[in-house]
Amino acid sequence: MKKGFRGTGTVERVDFPNKGIAVTDDGDRVIVKNTIPGQKVEFVVNKVKHQRAEGRLMEVIEKSPLETEEPCPHFGICGGCTYQTVPYEKQLDMKLTQVKKLISDAIGTEKESGYEFIGIHGSPKKSEYRNKMEFSFGDEYKDGPLALGMHKRGSFYDLVTVTDCQIVDEDFRTILKATLDYFSKNNIPYFHRATHKGYLRHLLVRKATKTGEIIVDLVTSTQTEGFNEEELLAGFRYALLTRQYDGRFKGVLHTKNDSVADVVKNEGTEVLYGDSYFYEELLGLKFKITPFSFFQTNSLGAEVLYETAREFILGDDKDSLNGKTVYDLYSGTGTIAQLMAPVCKEVVGVEIVEEAVCAAKENAALNGLDNCKFIAGDVLKVLDEIEEKPDYIILDPPRDGIHPKAIGKIIEYGVENMVYISCKPTSLARDLQIFMDRGYRVEKICCVDMFPNTYHIETIVALHRTDL
């Protein structure tokens, strides 16, 4: 099969991350992304490597027997959701199957390696679950009217205005509509990615699930030719605050970003209304969150994730960490560290993002926890500098997993038990092989779905040292 070949096939399975395996009438297999098992699809081969063909999805000729009608009018055009036409229980089955295959391919099956795969915990909310969205300004087609929303599937430039997005609640949709209406009426240009000219770039919206507090951050360039920026922003603030919401506004912000890269970057933020932060609650703890703070995007799902992790860590003995030191590596804003602090002597968190470390320290103080210590720096380097030795290690690395040299240093501590929380099962499978080669065995695994209607999945693994 050569590059440029156009063909059809039936998707027999989907591997993580979202790689459909389509089988042609001749028995050839082609990887086609954004597909669902059972679909008959048309594809064009765009890559052939090591006799493995990859194709671009052109059309779904026949729906899968798994599919129902899509609840979102933007589905298939918007690049956000992939599994929205699949009933939620079937989504969970698909994700569990994908993770099980990756893990068994890497370290063997449950029977071969002696671990227990507990299953998968679903998200408490299947729709309207996100507490954060980053919308982009642009157009839906070249020289078209102003759009505000998500990138179209497979496009770096074209957008779809997601006024009926189903993974956020009505307050997000109201804010999007109010913002788009206001800047469209005032003929304000968006920042063109090709020419680097224009004003409007992104709209960052965050809403706490538990407290209902809302914060909005408008991200723009500093190119203000043709209008009075102060008057424009005052009108924007008024357009937002005069709408009706279920939650309540905590702050309206304006961030400047002249970077040519199409990412939200903070080069200076001013408060247009209220405060530059809001509060969210998880499992009885309170967290102060700024527009650019890392925080799990599904608050209720995060509670399931962290409660499951805590059960893995403590097991049946709730006093097992009394008097002991816990390392929380890749600690982010310190959520897990603060959940474990009440049941151990000390938690030491290490995180490379300084702003996240500052937030972790502030939140620990907010929750009255004086036995949390947070250090800013690369885990690989910081481990050489910490005097306290751990009795237990919690790992929650970014998507790329743990650097092999860092794994080596972690293993050298020789702790009896560890828990690894992963947001990318391919990275997890690779890292587990290293741990097992160096004297650890996998005891149990559980998946937690934080992202309904997408292919993303969290996985928690308990590791036990075998050569003690």
Feature map (PLM): residue ranges:
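Rossmann-like S-adenosyl-L-methionine
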Residues: 1-7, 13-17, 222-468
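Terminal RNA-binding accessory module
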Residues: 1-74, 111, 153, 373, ...
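Short, acidic/hydrophobic/Gly-rich beta-strand patch recurrent on exposed beta strands
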Residues: 20-25, 149-152, 217-219, 360
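Short, conserved phosphate/pyrophosphate- and ester-handling motifs at nucleotide-, phospho-/glycolipid
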Residues: 38, 168, 298
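Extended interfacial segments that mediate partner engagement and assembly in macromolecular machines
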Residues: 59-70, 79-190, 210
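Short, solvent-exposed loop/turn elements at beta->coil junctions and helix N-caps
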Residues: 118-125, 193, 200-202, 447-450
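Internal alpha/beta scaffold segment
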Residues: 157-201, 222-254
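Structural signature of eukaryotic scaffold interfaces centered on beta-propeller domains
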Residues: 206-208
